A protein has these predicted regions:
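P-loop NTPase catalytic core of nucleic-acid-dependent motor ATPases
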Residues: 52
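Short strand-turn motif at the edge of the Rossmann-like AdoMet-binding core
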Residues: 55
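Long, low-complexity, repeat-rich, intrinsically disordered, solvent-exposed domains used
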Residues: 1-4
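C-terminal "post-core" interaction segments
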Residues: 9-12, 16-26, 36-37, 41-49, ...
Length: 255
């Protein structure tokens, strides 16, 4: 958390939408629980502005995006539609409107934000773009960084043949926000375009990071390098190895 006058700015680097260490073990929700607890800490510190770092996040589980979105939005829209998942005409019975979680489901972690700053890169995709597109129906979302990937569709995982060590994950549905908008096939163009690799790289959360620095400037009108703002608490960085794709198939290495 960074403090500038009455601005208490939360920052989260989120690199993959997974409910637990094994993305395909849906019974393990340890990551989701940790995320809820983290947002309770943000709320206890009176965070009223937020920077969400999705620059290296290529997507993941929609229900994890549902949780994150529900922790960020205004409290009075909890329970409203988040996104629409629409299948082809042969599977229209599977069409689903996914809601924002209810107040009781996000415990005490909802930040009740009026706006959100999202840091992006060229591999920001899928569930990350769902966050941007869906929250624009409820919040002022500012995008800082590079143009995103442009993945407006979702995939269904078929993992019945576990003994062979592979899964099938075809594209099966199109994703819209509640206003039926999904016009980002070419990715989201940033409101402020910045290529982080044109300057020295900094640690996540370091105010020398040009993307985070720009977000701080947008919020406060001050350059973070001209004024000291001390991050409160330890930064925690977790790594998920990249998944391999070939011809729209998700390839999972066998143990």
């Amino acid at each position: 958390v960074y403090t500038y006058g009455n601005k208490r700015i939360g920052y989260l680097m989120y690199n993959h939408f997974a409910s637990g260490p094994n993305e395909y073990d849906y019974s393990d929700t340890s990551y989701n629980l940790y995320l809820q607890q983290l947002f309770e800490k943000f709320k206890s510190r009176n965070v009223n502005e937020f920077v969400l770092d999705l620059r290296y996040n290529g997507g993941g589980l929609v229900n994890c995006a549902q949780l994150l979105a529900s922790l960020l939005v205004r409290e009075n829209v909890l329970g409203e539609p988040l996104c629409i998942m629409e299948y082809n005409d042969k599977n229209s019975n599977k069409n689903e409107t996914l809601p924002l979680l209810k107040t009781t489901e996000v415990m005490a972690g909802n930040l009740n934000l009026q706006r959100l700053f999202v840091l992006t890169g060229s591999t920001t995709a899928s569930a990350s773009e769902l966050i941007i597109n869906s929250l624009r129906s409820y919040l002022d979302v500012r995008v800082i960084g590079k143009q995103t990937f442009g993945k407006t569709v979702g995939m269904t995982i078929y993992n019945e043949s576990k003994k062979y060590g592979w899964i099938l994950s075809p594209v099966t549905f199109h994703i819209y926000n509640k206003d039926r908008e999904a016009d980002y096939e070419d990715g989201f163009h940033p409101d402020v375009a910045i290529d982080e690799f044109k300057s020295d790289l900094a640690e996540f959360g370091d105010l020398k990071d040009p993307l985070l620095g720009q977000a701080i400037y947008e919020i406060t009108g001050q350059s973070p390098l001209l004024r000291s703002a001390t991050p409160r608490g330890n930064r925690e960085i977790q790594y998920n190895p990249p998944l391999s794709y070939k011809d729209n198939l998700l390839l999972i290495p066998k143990d």
